[in-house]
């Protein structure tokens, strides 16, 4: 089980990323635009730098819903490999079963 402080920190980062997503996208669009002047791009760049660091989506870490494990998480199920195995063995995941050949 991951530390609860790490799990809460990651939840906070996800909320911030969602909150500032529109503003961040608008500023990035100005930066990538060929029509914008040099001054507009500099202004957009400074505004982008002043946004909270944790509002960047790349700082959000996918974690297991049950254990909080940061690595070995399957996106499709939202579970870590260990918890996915347990859920599969219990028959909690429809259509998923242990491979046998």
Swiss-Prot record:
Keywords: Ribonucleoprotein, Ribosomal protein, RNA-binding, rRNA-binding. One of its GO terms (biological process) is translation. Residues 33-69 are annotated as: Disordered. Pfam families: Ribosomal_S14. Residues 51-68 have a biased composition (Basic and acidic residues). GO terms for cellular component: cytoplasm; small ribosomal subunit. InterPro entries: Ribosomal_uS14 (IPR001209), Ribosomal_uS14_bac/plastid (IPR023036). The keyword Zinc does not apply. It comes from the Bacteria. Disulfide bonds: none annotated. GO terms for molecular function: rRNA binding; structural constituent of ribosome. PANTHER family: 30S RIBOSOMAL PROTEIN S14, SMALL RIBOSOMAL SUBUNIT PROTEIN US14M. Part of the 30S ribosomal subunit. Contacts proteins S3 and S10. Belongs to the universal ribosomal protein uS14 family. Binds 16S rRNA, required for the assembly of 30S particles and may also be responsible for determining the conformation of the 16S rRNA at the A site. NCBIfam families: PRK08881.1. This is Small ribosomal subunit protein uS14. It comes from Xanthomonas oryzae pv. oryzae (strain KACC10331 / KXO85). The gene is rpsN.
